[in-house]
Amino acid sequence: TGQSLNRARMLQKLLFGIQMYAKPLDPQVPQLIRGLNILSILEIFMTVVVGQDTAKTRRTLTVGSKSIAYYSIPAAQAAGLGDFSRLPAALKVVLENMLRFEDGKTVSVDDIKAFAEWGAKGGKNPREIAYRPARVLMQDFTGVPAVVDLAAMRDGIVALGGDPEKINPLNPVDLVIDHSVMIDEFGTPRAFQMNVDREYERNMERYTFLKWGQSAFNNFRVVPPGTGICHQVNLEYLSQTVWTDQDQNGQEVAYPDTLVGTDSHTTMVKGAAVLGWGVGGIEAEAAMLGQPISMLIPEVVGFELTGAMMEGTTGTDLVLKVVEMLRARGVVGKFVEFYGTGLDNLPLADRATIANMAPEYGATCGFFPIDDETIRYLHATGRDEDRVALVEAYAKENGFWRDETYAPIYTDTLHLDMGTIVPAISGPKRPQDFVALTEGQNAFRREMEETFKRPMGKQIAVAGEEYTMESGKVVIASITSCTNTSNPYVMIGAGLVARKAAALGMDSKPWVKTSLAPGSQVVSAYLEAADLQKDLDAVGFNLVGYGCTTCIGNSGPLQPEISAAISEGDLVATAVLSGNRNFEGRISPDVRANYLASPPLVVAYALAGTLDINLATDVIGQDRDGNDVYLKDIWPTTQEVAEMVEATVTREAFLSKYADVFKGDEKWQAVDVTNQKTYDWPAGSTYVQNPPYFQGITMETHKITDLEDAKVMAILGDMITTDHISPAGSFKDTTPAGKYLTERQVSPREFNSYGSRRGNHEVMMRGTFANIRIKNEMLDGVEGGYTLGPDGSQMAIFDAAMAYQEQGTPLVIFGGEQYGAGSSRDWAAKGTALLGVKAVIAESFERIHRSNLVGMGVIPFEFTGGDTRKSLGLNGDETVSIRGLEGVKPLQEVPAEITMSDGSVKSITLKCRIDTEVEIDYIENGGVLHYVLRNLAKAA
């Protein structure tokens, strides 16, 4: 395996070298080399180390003139390992992984039999298994800290006497730079180039570091800035549905394409039957380095879709209803698989939108099995014809194909007739808050009264403008996010709404910041081919960049006069975006109410300029002659959209735009890096710093011990998201992070964002629990990252944590339900650990954040017996002790004592959410990366 790795790496470097040095000699050489395709070369030389195959399930599949090995689920059943015939396709992917890696150690024959027992028990058998995904996907906000960790691990293994080359990804890793572009300029033809220029100005340190990582690490590729969003690039290009590799014996093996990603919306690719989900960066790093992912065989909820979408509705409307239904059912930690006759009427683009929002409905994944539509999509998006043929043959041969006979066993089921879907939005704070479009105005007014407690109608003058600002006005309208820009039907729909509106002489309202940020360059190709980009430009939706932008909070500043009016009047300004998240404080610090909507509805709301309207029936504006215009006047028919998609979204467009996906523009090509094996950490960098995790590491581990006399850092409510814990957006010079940068002569204009500075632990520690909308229940009527320090005075959470660390006092945090919901960002756990928090006690945890806490050595606990922070009457001046941790077992209940300020003691029982045996090892090592590092050092 090592020899193959080295050969692949040498050839990769050789090709890059030829590209670089041959250019002055012969301009044709770089193009010839690019034609060799690095991915194909790495697939030739990379190996998958398969197991011993005790049950002899390996078979050969012939596709065309080529024979390829695979691990047969029917053969496993014939060998007497159990009945697997009615397992859901999503679970069969995991089963195949067990067959391929069965080695008698990490994967046993009993692990394989457990899948048959799952079916016999009606879809339940939570056995711990070791799962190995084929590859890893990253974006730059989470990818930079991951590469920082890998670079630090190289330093760490050198300190332990090991070889730095031991720290190398064993599986393919793709990092797509998509999270850094911000919308500084909008509504003009120059917006795209100006935003790109500012992106490079802000992020050159980070980009240099990532390019060093690409040269220093095996199997690590970077998709440069300005290319697209990682999940859309993954869906349209990187994913293969069926992957192939050579095994250690040199034989080619086919198996399901699988991955984990350092972004929670990695789930999107399950629309194309690729099993993938989000993990924290620390878990992804462990997977890269060969550590299997420890998981329980999940429950699988079947979601039956029937019927077809009605005229006037979109895939976005469907997914918002699905999110509402699944959140109400409760599917955290479960797989969801979609089935039913309705799939015959559901394009893969709509499936991908539904799969994308799995984190919003709480599931580990939302999976769509392989069928005729999958094959059509793979061909349409430019996949190699031989690969498309392999996908179909493999799926039919190995039991992954969905047809009219597909009838799996599910743990639970739901049903939705797609003919009942109506146009909708979701908001103002949660993706599951579904609102039918006809009820939008009433719902907003109700939120104003009950949630925001603000009156309607208060008007504030805007300096230098003829209009006024008032609550409900839309100040941001953004066509953004892979969730919807990957879907040609809604993007063409938005363009047609713009065309009809522009033809009538309409425009977006002047107070609306409009933007179009597609997830891939293919979108621009078909919008240009359809001649729709000029219509979008005409109503303000100019291209601002290829990246996540508004969806992750990179919406950029509002016009200062508008921002001032909102602040002066304490108004509830609104944003409408085609994204997947609308958590408070996420989109813009000036916006309190955020609504998710389809791209055509985003355009319509920009034209109307307010949420205080029944968009379905009210007048949204006037044409050039003063005549009233309604939504129905500018809404395209389903047939109009379908015909234009058919005419303009072509295989040739995908082949063209992805031909040079790793090349980058001239700015990227000009980034110069060294070829050192270890990173030369720049002392003055405010973007990349050597983290403290591995400094001073030894081979010694420590047993888990009881927690004694911990103080309370924060008491938080329900649905505390990772955005609350570790915000990604901008910050001011008055914050601890802002003060840190100011002290280092960084001007506020150059602060960039928290997300862009995740390679610097000093900034990120100061940004932990620093969301401007977080509410610590220890303080009355205070928003933001504050708590009570050791002396009882109010101070920033970072300052209090440092004061407690000086005293040697451990800290705990109390939370409510769904603690850690939202993004997969591992800094929500890293920051928690670096602040000195030893335990988080909540009513329930979201899957990824719980895992991340364990991965950083912080123990999650859940209340039992109906106890909550409220029922216990906690106010933050208590002292907490948790006993019974020595020799603790996974999911064990342990006693805890809470000593109140008056000296009285409340004894409660907590459930330890260390879920598996290997997680015990992680905690004893101080975290998963310490565990991996010590094991690699031992093997050196």
Question: Across the structure, where does each feature detected by a protein language model lie?
Answer:
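Extracellular/luminal Protease-associated
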Residues: Y339-L346, N580, M802, E806-E846
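Long, structured ligand/cofactor-binding scaffold of large enzymes
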Residues: E102-T306, D317-L320, P423-S426, R445-F541, ...
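Terminal amphipathic helices with adjacent charged low-complexity linkers/tails
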Residues: R132, I157-R202, N345-K453, T617-Q676, ...
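Acidic, glycine-rich flexible loop/linker segments
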Residues: D623-T638, R850-Y922
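N-terminal amphipathic, basic-rich helices that act as targeting or association modules
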Residues: V48-R198, L346-T353, E360-D372, R376-H379, ...
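Long, charge-dense accessory insertions within large macromolecular proteins
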Residues: P599, E652-F798
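Mobile "lid/hinge" segments at catalytic clefts and subdomain interfaces of large enzymes
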Residues: G250-V388, A498, A502-P510, N542-T550, ...
